[in-house]
Amino acid sequence: MNQEQETKLVIITGMSGAGKTVAIQSFEDLGYYCVDNLPPALLPKFLDLMKDATNNIQKVALVMDLRGREFFDSLFEALDVLAKENWLEDHILFLDAKDEALVTRYKETRRSHPLATDGLPLDGIKQEREILDELRGRAQRIIDTTSLKPRNLREKILKVYKEEKQEVFSVHFVSFGFKYGLPIDADLVFDVRFLPNPHYVSNLQPLTGLNPDVSSYVFKWSDTQTFIDKVTDLLTFMLPQYKKEGKSQLVVAIGCTGGQHRSVALAEHFSKVLSNGYTTHVSHRDIDKRKVL
């Protein structure tokens, strides 16, 4: 590979039960194209596809989950090829944990270790640790997850691998009409049907909350301003808590009767207000439904 290749590669490997599933989910939140359990023999071919400029894939994370020595041999062959092509400057992440912690995790999940004989996880763990010892030595980064909860592991990965100024947590405001049902993906729902309805103002009825005349009408009422102040205070308090708990996205739904006027104007407003501290998005689920009814 030439030096102009911009694709960033992270290979996630390590002990079974050490947190590879949490790790790959964390890389997904960072915008990586993720593949779980790619056979090592397919790794060079897969990366050849990544070289195709039309893919426009700049960040790739792969979980290499070894299930036997035959995979181990083919993985090292693949790593040797990648090293010659300058893929692996700082891209092998090895997740580890003490035997006692791994045994406890397998007991809690009631799953068997992939290399265990007679269902005894410790036997499989010892065998896997022996197989992976050399690979562990080649890793550029090792994370011991013994004392880490899934949330802590995610935070650690985000801290290490996120790009400068990259914001992982985002807030999506969506307007909707109650007559069409609640958004199924909403985390928080606010009902603004108590506010004066532009639908009953003849010159505003055919417009939407995206129109300045409609938004001015919605915002001119004291109840609207009180609602905005209280919701802004609530979100200012809650968003850092959701972020701290490890959520990558919060969906805030704002509903009025038909999803045309009040909810649209307010969703736009909150998206702009909160954009000072967060990555925000706004969409209007039902804004076009009146046209087809």
From Swiss-Prot:
Binding-site list for GTP: 65-68
Membership in a protein family: Belongs to the RapZ-like family.
NCBIfam families associated with the record: PRK05416.1 (NF003828)
Protein name: Nucleotide-binding protein OB2468
Matches recorded under Gene3D superfamilies: P-loop containing nucleotide triphosphate hydrolases
Transmembrane residue ranges: none
Described function: Displays ATPase and GTPase activities.
Keywords: ATP-binding, GTP-binding, Nucleotide-binding
InterPro entries on file: P-loop_NTPase, RapZ-like, RapZ-like_N, RapZ_C
